[in-house]
Amino acid sequence: MKDLLNLFNQQRQTLDFDAIKIGLASPALIRSWSFGEVKKPETINYRTFKPERDGLFCAAIFGPIKDYECLCGKYKRMKHRGVVCEKCGTEVTLAKVRRERMGCIELASPVAHIWFLKSLPSRIGLMLDMTLRDIERVLYFEAYVVTEPGLTPLERRQLLTEEQYLQARQEHADDFDASMGAEAVYELLRMIDLQSEMARLREEIVVTGSETKLKRLTKRIKLIEAFIESGNRPEWMILTVLPVLPPDLRPLVPLDGGRFATSDLNDLYRRVINRNNRLCRLLELSAPDIIVRNEKRMLQESVDALLDNGRRGRAITGTNKRPLKSLADMIKGKQGRFRQNLLGKRVDYSARSVIIVGPNLRLHQCGLPKKMALELFKPFVFAKLQRRGLATTIKGAKKLVEREEAEVWDILEEVIFEHPVVLNRAPTLHRQGIQAFEPVLIEGKAIQLHPLVCTAFNADFDGDQMAVHVPLSLEAQLEARALMMSTNNILSPANGEPIIVPSQDVVLGLYYMSRALENKKGEGMVFANTSELKRAYDNSVVELHAKVKVRITEIETDDQGLRNKASSIVDTTVGRALLSEILPEGLPFVLVNTEMTKKNISRLINSSYRMLGLKETVVFADKLMYTGYAYATRAGVSICIDDMLIPLEKKEILGEAEQEVLEIQEQYQSGLVTAGERYNKVVDIWSRTNERIAKAMMDTIGTEKVVNTDGEIVDQKSMNSLYIMADSGARGSPQQIRQLAAMRGLMVRPDGSIIETPIKANFREGLSVQEYFNSTHGARKGLADTALKTANSGYLTRRLVDVTQDLCVVQLDCGTAGGLTMTPIVEGGDVVEPLKDRVLGRVVAEDVLLPGNDDEPIVTRSTLLDEQWVAKLEEAGVQSVKVRSPITCESPFGVCALCYGRDLARGHLVNMGEAVGVIAAQSIGEPGTQLTMRTFHIGGTALSAAAIDNIAVKTSGSVKFTNLKYVEHANGTLVAVSRSGEISVLDTHGRERERYKLPYGATINVKDMAEVKSGQILANWDPHNHPIVSEVAGFVRFIDFVDGVTVIEKTDDLTGLSSREIADLKRRGSQGKDLRPLVRIVDKKGNDLTIPGTDLSAQYLLPPRSIVNLQDGAPVGIGDVVAKIPQEASKTRDITGGLPRVADLFEARRPKDPAILAERSGVISFGKDTKGKQRLIIKDADGSEHEELIPKYRQIIVFEGEHVTKGETIVDGEPSPQDILRLLGIEPLAAYLVKEIQDVYRLQGVKINDKHIEVITRQMLRKVEIVDQGNSKFLNGEQVERQRVIDENAKLIARNELPAKYNPVLLGITKASLATESFISAASFQETTRVLTEAAVRGTRDNLRGLKENVIVGRLIPAGTGQTYHSQRRYSSVGLTESEMETLVGRSTSSGTEITSPSKDAIPLGSKVGF
């Protein structure tokens, strides 16, 4: 008994463990957990309320109800500890053992565990190699199964119906064994010899030819291997004894009124016990077979319901028709154990209240109501009251506090002095949603919040609430102060830009004071310094907006780092000069000598942070805010209805538009345009008109005519209140002003299509009834969308966090030479993102050389590029830089600091232990709610711009062709005959300024390397038709042109010219099925010509709907158009935009009709078509051919004889990321994902750093597929964690054996989360049952590496400050010293390169980074 007691005392200490293993419980193990068998279904006695003996709450089995007191009351108190009462059988011990002691039920007949039966793929089915349907028939007593065939012709595991069984019995008497129910399955499982079965399967897999059989065999081998390795036995999947949960985990609570509230589990257990007992009695009475069978089936069903109610058949419901919550339901879903209790816990010492603005707070402060503070800091106050001798006991102190005596407030002031509190606003979408502040006691009941942190919290003061938490321990206070203080979170982790940026009224005030106006009082005065100017302003000698000259003194730092004063007389305004007074030393006056719009203020704060560091910036931000508020108050900006100026030209513009619409209507009625064209054109006209009126309106509102000092009338930016607000970025946008004063424009129907009648009125004029009705359409859709968007965006964030949660910075340098090559992002000729923005804060992977000089590196390998370096690169005209990336990082777990680069929120190299995965997930998920949900239809307002049909240069320079194939036309122009060709404009230094894609068939007006002037047109093409260009000169010969079958002759009514259109396949009838209309180019004698450089004849296959304007036998020259394909058809694809698009990319979903990419490089030719498919052949350099069958409705965008490279698009569509990975490799895949995701966010004006997307891509590429197992233990086609294969291969190579070969696999984020090594993390994410079943069979061990697993087991997370704790635990258990540990963790880089960084934040190597 003593040992038993010690056992429990040991259990009270928290166990120290490094990993958690899950497995199947054997009957012996279940019995060893049990403290007695539960024999009766009774719970408690309704009169005495004491638990029944041997019942579900029995005290003898589960322990006493009161501490150290047996049930009958014979033994009480500590002195009898450990005694078992002979009367009631209760052990005298703590009552809390009722939370940990289990019971058991001995089942009269074995029962299959539903998880291993029904959780697909069925483990029992796989193990026995039987279908689930068959096993269910056996288990639920519908069929017999042969367990031992003996010498009979029957097979083992053969199913027999009742008739077949009786017949077999007659024929073979007792020579064979067959039975039904779980006993039969148990027998079959028990007979399996895993080792010999394994050997048999391994032999079979070598000889098998069928693909499906191979898959099944592989699955079985993996399962049997799992059983062998984990030491589980197959028959343990059948339960012979059922464990019973401790009673305090399924409590029975008395309610007032004599009723009881009970856990559903008790009902489920009662059913099992009742049926089990009845079955025992029936077996004792040897009842008829059919009754016993029925009872056994009912027992099986009740155990199924207990384990997972509703998994099979109808769910068992309670009294109120609600399905009962089974054991499986307890752990899964949002309300389950994992997500409700382990990952989300309630916190003590917290409060919540409404927030109000605190404009006089400093950035690190928040106002805390006195009442709230007193409650939160109670324990500290009690302690201090006692220490001061104001109260002798805690009780006394409590009384003092309750009475709110005067001294209590003094002590509260002392207690909260420099004790940070943590504020949080739900939803916490990124780490800026929780920040620490120093409390300031205030009257009232609302929390005061500093206005500058509102952006980070996404808070406003329209009734938002926030929660306050108190960090108690010293470490917690330290972390709150050092890491979470609002002053330490100035930059956003998503893009490294300041998040502490003034908004709204502050911006308005700063903008107002920095505006310059003509002819104001005091214009032209000169001041000796700002204080003189301030005197003049205070005495109303000059006005705030007057243009004056002032002597400004600045501090400049020279090359040697010495600080010198420099004075100069500057043209400025009174307001800007006043603003310069709050400018910290070291910031140039130029930064404020401009209109202070929101963008400029952000730039100012950013420069301050980079140039002066954190402390100065925080002080400066506060000063900016105070100044902004002061001048906003003085400005007294207000709006009235007359501020909405309606442009005079509006009437005229509307008249013109209505006239154009009428003309199109007439054209439509006379049949010149189709309904679709008419609709598109009308929508186009109104979009254009809206733009014109809006422009006129902005000109009217934005400028005013004034008289300057010379008496001339000049235009100046107006001080119209509406315009000021929009222009400064304080509130509103030109779009909204357009609705107020120009016209509302086109409205959208709920399905995303556009209503073609626009709302011509604006809000000032007021809407007509019809217009109002039309506008409710779109408005209501907007509201509905927002509601749906929030849920979708939250789910995306959850998946992202789950896939990256275990990714931290684990070492300084992994020593890889790999990386990604960064180039500027160019769209439609404009550089959307210059190179400097893309490489800022990254580490260079290989030396960057000066363009045109290969000996002199500008930047050496392993340099962290900060602002200064990036400026140098830009000066030198570097066009591409290879930088380290998380995708190519070779750290076994996590990433290394150099591959990650700069910590965007701190501005220096990332610290060890930073949880970069979660930060990436938050940065991508947080703006999710700003993305749209809708799918754009082509030709909506989304793309209402007119089609582009030429390239006009924006800057002068020289032209460079890239990847461009072209032929020279007789008239001297060039015609493009390639698809991936690009044309760039370089400046005098050879830097690329613009880049454009050239479509096939474009006419190019310049030669390579020619000089061009700004505005010159380089190339033009027909945007509505795709031409087919002849590459040889000769004569046209039509092949398979049959009038009325393959071609339709059309004559234009207006011009009288005839053209031939190739008929659609569906219209051709039977005789035209095998005809392939094509145009062949022949010489004078009629011999075929070949395309230069190939042996293919010059012939062009004509797709349906293409139009030929030439006659048979007509001459063609090089570069002439043989035929054209109208482009309307292919462009009706919807563009999935916004959130769904981002989700599709991260889930790596294949698009509906994916683009078909060339499987290899070679020359295109077309083979014989099959039914409904076209045959495309690629012949590579060594003459081998690759065939591709393509459905007829797909648009092939390559022609006969064209040369394609591997991975190039040959059939139009959205490329599938899997294809890009397979054909082009990891780097192009990364580039594709980053580009596509960034496009969506860029459209919404959201900036996210590329590296966050790369971090997620890294997690999507964690697995590899084995293509050749070599001598490894992996199976072909198996998906394995990359690191495991690398480790295994290293061992094999060391033993001189064949390593496994593998290909990378791209998994979507949901799949990747579920395929993680940690089963705890996967189970708490989704599909809990499936994950746990799989893990139990495998006997998986969870090494608790990620953040989630550690939160669940209640430990510090292995990131940030918790990483030190973890590494110490790990190494102290191995017995390493501190210095040995340091070398292991890798403080120095493995490749011996030093990180250089010219900024003052340089980190010397060998120093501890971070905390």
Curated annotation (Swiss-Prot):
Pfam family, one: RNA_pol_Rpb1_2
Compositionally biased tracts (Polar residues): 1387-1399
Signal peptide location: none
EC code(s) of this entry: 2.7.7.6
Residues the record lists as binding Zn(2+) 2: C814, C889, C896, C899
GO biological process: DNA-templated transcription
Molecular functions per Gene Ontology: DNA binding; DNA-directed RNA polymerase activity; magnesium ion binding; zinc ion binding
Region Disordered: start-end pairs: 1387-1411
Quaternary organization: The RNAP catalytic core consists of 2 alpha, 1 beta, 1 beta' and 1 omega subunit. When a sigma factor is associated with the core the holoenzyme is formed, which can initiate transcription.
Entry similarity comment: Belongs to the RNA polymerase beta' chain family.
Name of the protein described by the UniProt record: DNA-directed RNA polymerase subunit beta'
Organism, as annotated: Xylella fastidiosa (strain M12)
